[in-house]
Each structure stands twice: as structure tokens, then as C-alpha cells.
């Protein structure tokens, strides 16, 4: 049961973090003048629209994975340079901000847990979920700062 709780927490955390990351790219591209992601149905917080099933399974079980890239057309940006910059930076910024938000939630989860005798699967899930939210947000932020195409 412990394995299942950990895999569930990891799956839900990576789903939330990657969905926020991809949505940020789509939203900022739209605000900069490119409706391509909206037309493709990708400007949504629905995780099913952003995930490659194999990439998600690989992420949960192998520790690495991928989501479908958000389609953008740079020619539609009102200001080409700033549109490209902000659309690319949006995922990193959202991951950084979400790590900043998820860390206090993780600290609260640890304080909420109490003593070892009182722990339940719900406590374990809450701790693991908030821990993975923070860790994935921060690691995606750092990983996406690496200067490799198409990050």
C-alpha cells in the first residue's frame, strides 16, 4: 500500500506541475497575440490535453518524461522579440512561483502529521504530495533553464 500511495502522490503532483507549466506557455502566447494554442485546445488546465501518455508513465516510473509541447506561431506575436521571450519564460516563471507556494504547504503538511503512531495513509499521501509538488516545481524550473533546444 505504501508503494501505491507514493505512486499516486507522484502521479498527481507531476500532472499538476506539468499542466501549470504548459498552460502558462499557452496563456502567455495568447496574451502576446498568438491564438494557435487556443485554437488547438491547449489553453486549458485539463491535464489530458497536455500529456503524452508514454511521457507521463515514463515520468512516474523512470523519473523522466515529457508533455506535448504547446503549439505557437511566432509570426502572430504583436512584438516578436518580447512575445518569444515571455512565452518561453512563462513555464519557468510558473514553476518557480509554484515552488514558492508549494514549500509552505509542504511545511504545513509536516506539522499536520503529528507523531509516528498517529500516521495514516492520508497523512503519508499529504506529505508525499506536497513534497513532490515542491520538488517537481523546482526541478522543472532549473531543468528548463538549461540552454538546450527545445526547452
Segments (PLM) and residue ranges:
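Hydrophobic transmembrane alpha-helices and their immediate loop junctions
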Residues: 1-151
